[in-house]
From Swiss-Prot:
ARM repeats lie at residues 51-92, 95-134, 138-176, 178-217, 224-265, 269-309, 313-352, 421-460, 463-502, 505-544, 548-587, 590-632, 635-674, 681-720. The keyword Cytoplasm applies. It comes from Xenopus laevis. This is Armadillo repeat-containing protein 8. SMART domains: ARM (SM00185). One of its GO terms (cellular component) is ubiquitin ligase complex.
Length: 720
C-alpha cells in the first residue's frame, strides 16, 4: 500500500528513524493482544504534539497496521478505539501526513467503523474523520461517494454531544456548492440540526450555526426553509438575531450575521427587515473595528460587502455607521513587504520580553489541534509598542495583510456601487486613490482583483472621472493590468476602461494615444463572452463622436472578418454592443459615406442577416437605427435604395405591431425622403411604388403621438 511521505527521506535520516521509532511499530505485530493494545496506547502518548514522531511512524508503515487492527473483527473494541485515536493524532500533523493517510484509504475504514454499536469507538472515528475532512488536502467529494453515509451520519446525531459537534463540523466543511447543499438538504439536515442551536454545548451550537451558514449561501430553497423553521417556539431568524448580541462570543456573532446575510441575499429576508437593518448590518460593522482579530475583520468586511452589494439603502446606512469608511483605512496599515516585516522582527529582537502563547490561557483547556495552531492575532501597533508576539505569531499576523486589503477594497466597492455622495466620501479618505493605484500592482492576484473592482465601482462617478481619476492618472496602471492578467481581473479591468472611455472622461484621450485600440480589439477575440462584450463596449464608447482617424483605426484593428464574426455572436450582449459600435462609427455624413464606401457591401449583408434572424426587439431596433444612419449619408443612402430586399424590410417594420420597431423604421424613411437633398424625388417615388406612402397615411392617424408626428413629417416631404 502506497503509504509514504513525499519526498522520500534520505537513507541517513531513515536509519535514525528506524532506530528511534521501530519498536513502536514492531509491537503492533505482537501475537499477544494485550501487548498490541499497550503498544498502541504507548504510540498514542508518543505522537501527541510530536510531528516528527508522527512522520517517522508513517514512514515505518504504522498506518496500514493500525487500519488493519481497526477493521479486524477479532480486535477488541478498546483496541479499535485506541487505533482510531492514534490515527486521529497522526492526521493532526502536516498535510503530508494527511496525504499518506488518504493513500492508505483511511476514510472508508473510519466510515465502516461508524457502523459499530460502541459509542466511544464511534466518537473516535468521527473525531478522526473530522480532522481528515477539514484538512485542505482532502477531497470533500469523498464524503458523498457512498450514498448511505449522509443518512447514517444523520442517525448518529442523536448519540452524543461529541457526535453532534463532529458531524456538524464535517457537514460545514464539506458543503462546497449547490450540489452538496441539495444532498444535505434532501436528507433533512435542516430539521436534524436546527434543535442543536439550543444545545447546552457551545461547540455544538457553533458548529450547527456554521453548518447553516454554508447551507444558506446563495441558495433560495434552503434559505426559505430556514426562515420558516421553529425551534422551541422561535423562528430560526429570531434565534440567529439573538446570537448577534454584544455579550455573545465574537465567533458566534459573526457566524450568525453570515447566516442572516445569506438568507437576505437569497431573498428569504427583506433588506428593510429590522433584523438586517438594526442588527445584522451594525454587527458586521462592529466586526470591522480595529479591536477585533485580523481574521474577524476580514470576514466581517467581506460579509458586509456581500450584504449591501445590491441594495443602495443598506449602502447608505452602512456608510454612516460607526465611521465605517474611515475605519477601513486601518486595513491598509499592516505591512506586506519583506523589509517592513524585517524591521518589525528586528525591533522584536532587541531584548524586549515576549510572552509564550501557551502561558496566555489556562492549562488543560485546549486539545492537540488547538495547541499546534496559533489562533490569536494582534494589531501591528501592539506588535511595535508592546512586543507581545513570538516570531511565529508575527508571521501569522503578517500573512493577513493581503486579506485585509482585499476585504477593504471589496467593501469600498460595495459601498460606492450606487450613491455619488458615498463615492465622494470614499475617494476623499486619506490616500485612497494612492491605495487603489498601489493595489493594482500588488503581488496577490486577489488583492489586484479587489482593487480593480473598487476602481470600477468608483468609476461610475462622472465627477470623479473628471477629477480624482485624472489627477492620479489611474488609466496608466489600469492599462498595465490589462496587458497581462487572469480573465477574472481582465473582465473587471476592461469594464472600468469602458467608463474611462466615455466622452466626458479626460482619460479618454491619453488612453487612445497609449495603443488601446489594439488591446481592445484583441479582447473581442477572447473565448470569454464577458471579455468580448467589454472589448466591443469600450470600442463603442471610443467611437462615440470620434474623428475619422480613430474610427478608421478601430475598423482596421477589428478587420471586416472579425466585425462580422461579432455580429453573428451567440451572446446577445456581444451582438448589441457590436451594433452600438457600428451605429457610432456611422454617425456623421462624411464618416458614413467614407465607411460605407469601403465596407458597405458587408454591412448591408449583416443588416439583412440580422433583420431576417430570430432576434429580440432590441437587436432589431438597433439594426434599424444603423439603417437610419446609413440613410442619412450623402452617397451611402444609395446602398439602401438599390437594395430591394432592404426596402421591403423597412416597409415591413414600419407596419410592425411593435412601436419601437415602427419608430426606428420611420427614421429610415424620413432620412430617405428628406426633400432638401439631391435625388429626393426619385427616392420618394420609389418608396411610393412599394406602398410606403399608404402606410404613412395610416400611421398619421396613430394613437401614439410620437409615431403620428413622424408619419406626418414624412408625408409633408411629398407635398413640400
Amino acid at each position: 500500500m502506497a503509504c509514504v511521505l513525499e519526498p522520500p527521506l534520505r537513507m541517513s535520516v531513515l536509519s535514525e528513524v528506524t532506530a528511534s521509532s521501530r519498536h513502536y511499530v514492531d509491537r503492533l505485530f505482537d501475537p499477544d493482544p494485550q501487548k498490541v493494545l499497550q503498544g498502541v496506547i504507548d504510540m498514542k502518548n508518543a505522537v501527541i504534539g510530536n510531528n516528527k514522531q508522527k512522520a517517522n511512524l508513517i514512514v515505518l508503515g504504522a498506518v496500514p497496521r493500525l487500519l488493519y487492527l481497526l477493521q479486524q473483527e477479532t480486535s477488541s473494541t478498546e483496541l479499535k478505539t485506541e487505533c482510531a485515536v492514534v490515527l486521529g493524532s497522526l492526521s493532526m500533523g502536516t498535510e503530508n501526513n494527511v496525504k499518506s493517510l488518504l493513500d492508505c484509504n483511511i476514510i472508508p475504514a473510519l466510515l465502516q467503523g461508524l457502523l459499530s454499536s460502541d459509542l466511544q469507538f464511534i466518537e473516535a472515528c468521527l473525531r478522526c474523520l473530522r480532522t481528515v475532512f477539514t484538512s485542505p488536502v482532502t477531497p470533500v467529494e469523498l464524503l458523498y461517494t457512498d450514498a448511505s453515509v449522509i443518512p447514517h451520519l444523520m442517525l448518529l446525531l442523536s448519540r452524543s454531544i461529541y457526535a453532534q459537534e463532529y458531524i456538524c463540523q464535517i457537514y460545514a466543511h464539506c458543503c462546497k456548492g449547490p450540489d452538496h447543499q441539495t444532498i444535505l438538504f434532501n436528507h433533512g439536515v435542516v430539521q436534524n440540526i436546527a434543535h442543536l442551536l439550543t444545545s447546552v454545548s457551545y461547540k455544538v451550537r457553533m458548529q450547527a450555526l456554521k453548518c447553516f451558514s454554508v447551507l444558506a449561501f446563495d441558495n433560495p430553497q434552503v434559505s426559505m426553509t430556514l426562515a420558516n423553521v421553529l425551534v422551541d417556539g422561535e423562528l430560526l431568524p429570531q434565534i440567529f438575531a439573538k446570537m448577534l448580541q454584544r455579550d455573545k462570543p465574537i465567533e458566534m456573532q459573526l457566524t450568525a450575521a453570515k447566516c442572516l446575510t445569506y438568507m437576505c441575499r437569497a431573498g428569504s429576508i427583506r433588506t428593510d427587515d429590522n433584523c438586517i437593518v438594526l442588527k445584522t448590518l451594525p454587527c458586521l460593522v462592529r466586526m470591522c473595528s480595529k479591536e477585533r482579530l485580523l481574521e474577524v475583520r476580514v470576514e466581517g468586511a467581506e460579509t458586509l460587502a456581500y450584504l449591501i452589494e445590491p441594495d443602495v439603502e443598506l449602502q447608505r446606512i452602512a456608510s454612516i455607521t460607526d465611521h465605517l469608511i474611515s475605519m477601513l483605512a486601518d486595513y491598509f496599515k499592516y505591512p506586506s513587504s519583506v523589509s517592513a516585516i524585517t524591521d518589525i522582527k528586528r525591533h522584536q529582537e532587541t531584548g524586549q520580553p515576549c510572552i509564550d502563547p501557551e502561558e496566555a490561557e489556562p492549562r488543560g483547556t485546549r486539545d492537540e489541534s488547538q495547541c499546534t495552531a496559533l489562533s490569536i492575532s494582534h494589531p501591528v501597533s501592539q506588535i511595535q509598542h508592546d512586543c507581545l508576539l513570538t516570531s511565529e505569531e508575527l508571521d501569522h499576523d503578517l500573512k493577513h495583510a493581503h486579506e485585509l486589503r482585499q476585504a477593504a477594497f471589496k467593501l469600498y466597492a460595495s459601498l460606492g456601487a450606487n450613491d455619488e455622495d458615498i463615492r465622494k466620501k470614499i475617494i476623499e479618505a486619506e490616500h485612497m486613490m494612492d491605495r487603489i493605484v498601489n493595489g493594482l500592482s500588488e503581488t496577490s492576484v486577489k488583492v489586484r482583483l479587489a482593487a480593480v473592482r473598487c476602481l470600477h465601482s468608483l468609476s461610475r462617478s462622472v465627477q470623479q472621472l473628471r477629477t480624482s481619476f485624472q489627477d492620479h492618472a489611474v488609466w496608466k496602471p489600469l492599462m498595465k493590468v490589462l496587458q497581462n492578467a487572469p480573465d477574472d481581473i481582465l473582465v473587471v479591468a476592461s469594464s472600468t476602461l469602458c467608463n474611462l472611455l466615455l466622452e466626458f472622461s479626460p482619460s479618454k484621450e491619453p488612453i487612445l494615444e497609449s495603443g488601446a485600440v489594439e488591446l481592445l480589439c484583441s479582447l473581442t477575440l477572447s473565448e470569454n463572452p464577458a471579455l468580448r462584450v467589454n472589448g466591443i463596449w469600450a470600442l463603442m464608447n471610443m467611437a462615440f463622436q470620434a474623428d475619422q482617424k480613430i474610427k478608421s483605426d478601430i475598423l482596421r484593428g477589428l478587420s471586416t472578418e472579425q466585425l462580422f464574426q461579432l455580429l453573428s455572436d451567440s451572446d446577445v450582449n456581444v451582438l448589441m454592443k457590436t451594433l452600438g459600435l457600428l451605429r457610432n462609427l456611422l454617425s456623421t455624413r462624411p464618416h458614413i459615406d467614407q465607411i460605407m464606401s469601403t465596407h458597405g457591401k458587408q454591412i448591408m449583408q449583416a443588416v439583412t442577416f440580422i433583420l431576417e434572424g430570430e432576434h429580440n426587439i432590441e437587436v432589431k431596433e438597433q439594426t434599424l437605427c444603423i439603417l437610419a444612419n446609413i440613410a442619412d449619408g450623402t452617397t451611402a443612402k444609395d446602398l439602401i435604395m438599390t437594395n430591394d430586399d432592404i426596402l421591403q424590410k423597412i416597409k415591413y417594420y414600419v407596419g410592425h405591431s411593435n412601436l419601437k420597431l415602427q419608430l426606428a423604421a420611420m427614421f429610415c424613411i424620413a432620412n430617405l425622403t428628406w426633400n432638401e437633398e439631391e435625388g429626393s424625388q426619385e427616392r420618394q417615388d420609389k418608396l411610393r411604388e412599394i406602398g410606403i406612402v399608404d402606410i404613412l397615411h395610416k400611421l398619421s392617424q396613430s394613437t401614439d403621438p410620437n409615431l403620428c408626428d413622424k408619419a406626418k413629417t414624412a408625408l409633408q416631404q411629398y407635398f413640400a
